[in-house]
Amino acid sequence: MRENGAVMSFVARLIATTNVDSLRALSRNKVLKRALSARDLASIGIGAMIGGGIFTTIGTGVKGAGPAVILSYLLAGFTSFFAALCYAELGAMVPIAGSAYTYAYATLGKLAAWIVGFALIFEYGISAAPVAQAFSAAVGDVLKSAGLGLPQWAQTSNLVIHGAWWQPSSYDFAHSQYDVIAAVFVLLIAGLLSLGIRESATANNIFVVLKISALLVFIVAGATLFHGANFHDFIPHGWGALVPFGGAVEASQPYGIIPIAAFVFFSYIGFDAATTTAEECKNPQRDIPLGVLGALGIGTVLYCATAVVLLGSTPWRNVPDKNPLVYALSPLHL
């Protein structure tokens, strides 16, 4: 009986929740400086969304859905809208740091909160790696185009594997290339974040302006190459075909509007980042919903506009997987 009681006590601790009123009381203590406005929260969400996603997924998306990739982005944005409503309501209801971890703690218990918290840590950590590598590759391409080559030790990473990837003995770290530029980039961003919320928010606003400006430049410049005839075969692969009719493709390549919507959904990840700073915004009940929904709305409009211009300026069968936006503007010799 005593052992059963100990087990039940342990299980009770795992599923124990915290009172929402207690969490609200913590937010009123103002442990962190409340310095962010709705505009700052929207900027944080946009900064997290518009990263490597649109630049790396749209080429593959066009290959899988053709011009109908526009519908895939709309469908992914529509699906994200319901998740955004949940984040907006919960963030306004429990305006303290932690985002999904805090919401899980208040409703599902400690164990679920622990799982969600570490999932978020892994999500933000792992997703930062390809973005940092993309930045490193972009730096290398810019320097190469300017006639300034990087030394061998500073070039992008190259992991050498001999054999099966799941066997630790297959990895040849001695002959692998480490991405120094990506590592330095991550360290600089981490240092910037440690300066304080106001400083990091200001820097994020600058980066967001640069990202949006780059997309707007593409939209305006690409519009000069627009040809409506490129949209005649608008839905070449249907809504959910696994492979094109009568064709053979790689098993890992999704085809159709709905599968591609699931693929490009990666571009929308990040709008929830605004809720992680709930304890640092001036008026969370007002600012969090505006920030989350504003970030998602702006991101959706930019993604769809970019897809329309890309497909209007380039026949969809000619759109490459790598650097499709640069390829689309190549006739302008910018």
Kindly label every feature range from the protein language model.
Residues 81, 131, 138-145, 194-197, ...:
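Transmembrane helix-loop junctions and nearby membrane-interface residues
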Residues 46, 74-78, 118-126, 184-191, ...:
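Hydrophobic alpha-helical transmembrane segments of multi-pass membrane proteins
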Residues 16, 26-32, 69-70, 74, ...:
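Helix-loop-helix junctions that connect adjacent transmembrane segments
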Residues 56-169, 174, 298, 302:
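Extracellular loop-to-transmembrane helix junctions
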Residues 2-57, 63-65, 80-85, 96-97:
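Membrane-interface "cap" regions at the ends of multi-pass membrane proteins
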